[in-house]
Each structure stands twice: as structure tokens, then as C-alpha cells.
Curated annotation (Swiss-Prot):
Homodimer. The gene is isp. Major intracellular protease produced by Bacillus subtilis. Its main location: cytoplasm. This is Major intracellular serine protease. GO terms for molecular function: serine-type endopeptidase activity.
């Protein structure tokens, strides 16, 4: 297992000290409409496998239920999950920043976050073994969702096994598709673990649903979400706008927390990983973009409601 895995590279658009607004990405995927139904991801556990997290950030501290360090940062201390890069803190905020104290809100503001530090240093890189151990730890902790905005060029059998084992245990595994794209649907760019069929691979679009040129193309892309100029939390009580498929993936992880919570209440039972995935795909809008780039389309949490409304209107018109 030579080589390393890295955070999916991202662009820092700006850093901001003081914020009190709902990020555009949260609005355009229709998360607030789910909140209006009383669904905010309560009792859903999301493991964030990344560069760690600023656990004292006011928008995050009440959502974090624990964590573990698998890197050699801080002498490898298991409870040292500080974020020396900012990437992990930003991803965590998009998933579940609390909505009750100003600042920003994440997609699922009442979901619980397990911080699994698998990427170290200021540049956010890690060994395959760290990622594999992090996935296995998240499964042991009985999380509902694993969110990974990381990837590498190598298809490592042990990594695939860890992912398959997570899915077998009912965990939804979400991964950023990667930023090696060239905007051409015919050329494939593969980043692992996103390129594994078992993973929910997320590409990036703008909030106007235009494809991000950097978003990877391949046959395993499942859907796209906002990944450009995404406002979220950064270390030291700051906020910032970042760009990349790294920012798109946590929108889907947060959305899955809402969907799982809502649908299990509706069905009055636990849903399997494949059942929750089916409910996610119901909540997408097809785009006029090749499936190798956009998969099933754009994450849109109210899609079933709007379809039902249209059907009702056309039914009335035919009466």
C-alpha cells in the first residue's frame, strides 16, 4: 500500500471573520424545506474522514460527539483531532453546522458528527492505511454515513474491502468525485475511493446547476451538488468560501442524514443502505449534462413533492 491519498485539492475563494447567513448551496438543494417538516437529521451519525476539525467552532461544537486521530500529527495522539488545514472543518460545517446561534447552518443542523482524522499536516495527505483504519473505526462506531472528500490515483484492494464492508454494514459511503476533470464527458478521470461502485460519488456544479469544469468524469458518478464558492466554517471561529468536489460531497452527506431520518419515520422501520440510496436518487433533478459528468442529476430534496404537485395539476387539467 505505497503512495498516499490526499484531500481533494480545493480553491480558497475568500476567508471571512463574521457571518450570519444561510449558504446558497444549502438553499438551492432545498434543505430548508425539509427543516420546515421538522426534519434536521436528529439521531443520525455522520463520520467525517478528513483533516480533523476545529471542535471549538461555535457552529460545530454542539454537533461533535467524538473523534479519533489516525495520522502522525501531534505524535499520533488518538484524541488529537485538530485541523491544521481547514478542509475538514469546512466539510463538517456543510454537513451539520448548527442553525441556532447565528453563523451559518449545515444541510442537517441536528445531525451528529464523528471526526475521524485521516489526513495530516498542513497539506492534508495520508497513508492508505490511515483511511482504511478510519473507515473501519467509523463502522465500529455504528455511524449512518461516512463522508470522504479525499482521493488518490491507486485502486488499493484493502481500501475497496473496507468500503464494501462499510456498505455491507448498512453505512452510506459518500465521496468527492475528484477535481482532475477537463470538462470532456469522453475522457475518464478516476479517483479512489470515489470510483468504486459501492461509493456514492459526487460531482460538482455551480448553484446555477452549471457543470464545474474541474469535476471528474467517469461511469461511477452518481449525482452532482453545489461545489463552487461554498460558504462554510473554518478553524479559529472563521468562515470561508471554498471550491471543489470536496465541497459538493458534504451537501450529499447532509442530505442523506435528512432523507434517512425522514424516510425511516415514514416507513416506521430501518431502511437498508440501498433503500436510502434509492430515496436519494428520487431527490435529484435530471440535467442536460452527460451522465458520466452528472450521474442521475442535481441534488434537490423536494423533487418528489414537486413531481406530485405537477401530476396533481395535470390530473385536474384532464378532468
Amino acid at each position: 500500500m505505497n503512495g498516499e491519498i490526499r484531500l481533494i485539492p480545493y480553491v480558497t475563494n475568500e476567508q471571512i471573520m463574521d457571518v450570519n447567513e444561510l449558504p446558497e448551496g444549502i438553499k438551492v438543494i432545498k434543505a430548508p424545506e425539509m427543516w420546515a417538516k421538522g426534519v434536521k437529521g436528529k439521531n443520525i451519525k455522520v463520520a467525517v474522514l478528513d483533516t480533523g476539525c476545529d471542535t471549538s467552532h461555535p457552529d460545530l461544537k454542539n454537533q461533535i460527539i467524538g473523534g479519533k486521530n489516525f495520522t502522525d500529527d501531534d505524535g499520533g495522539k488518538e484524541d488529537a483531532i485538530s485541523d491544521y488545514n481547514g478542509h475538514g472543518t469546512h466539510v463538517a460545517g456543510t454537513i451539520a453546522a448548527n442553525d441556532s446561534n447565528g453563523g451559518i447552518a449545515g444541510v442537517a443542523p441536528e445531525a451528529s458528527l464523528l471526526i475521524v482524522k485521516v489526513l495530516g499536516g498542513e497539506n492534508g495527505s495520508g497513508q492508505y492505511e490511515w483511511i482504511i483504519n478510519g473507515i473501519n473505526y467509523a463502522v465500529e462506531q455504528k455511524v449512518d454515513i461516512i463522508s470522504m472528500s479525499l482521493g488518490g490515483p491507486s485502486d488499493v484492494p484493502e481500501l475497496k474491502e473496507a468500503v464494501k464492508n462499510a456498505v455491507k454494514n448498512g453505512v452510506l459511503v459518500v465521496c468527492a468525485a475528484g477535481n482532475e476533470g477537463d470538462g470532456d464527458e469522453r475522457t475518464e478521470e478516476l479517483s479512489y475511493p470515489a470510483a468504486y461502485n459501492e461509493v456514492i460519488a459526487v460531482g460538482s456544479v455551480s448553484v446555477a446547476r452549471e457543470l464545474s469544469e474541474f469535476s471528474n468524469a467517469n461511469k461511477e458518478i452518481d449525482l452532482v451538488a453545489p461545489g463552487e464558492n461554498i460558504l462554510s466554517t473554518l478553524p479559529n471561529k472563521k468562515y470561508g468560501k471554498l471550491t471543489g468536489t470536496s465541497m459538493a460531497a458534504p451537501h450529499v452527506s447532509g442530505a442523506l442524514a435528512l432523507i434517512k431520518s425522514y424516510e425511516e419515520e415514514s416507513f416506521q422501520r430501518k431502511l437498508s443502505e440501498s433503500e436510502v440510496f434509492a430515496q436519494l436518487i428520487r431527490r435529484t433533478l435530471p440535467l442536460d449534462i452527460a451522465k458520466t459528468l452528472a450521474g442521475n442529476g442535481f441534488l434537490y430534496l423536494t423533487a418528489p413533492d414537486e413531481l406530485a404537485e405537477k401530476a396533481e395539476q395535470s390530473h385536474l387539467l384532464t378532468l
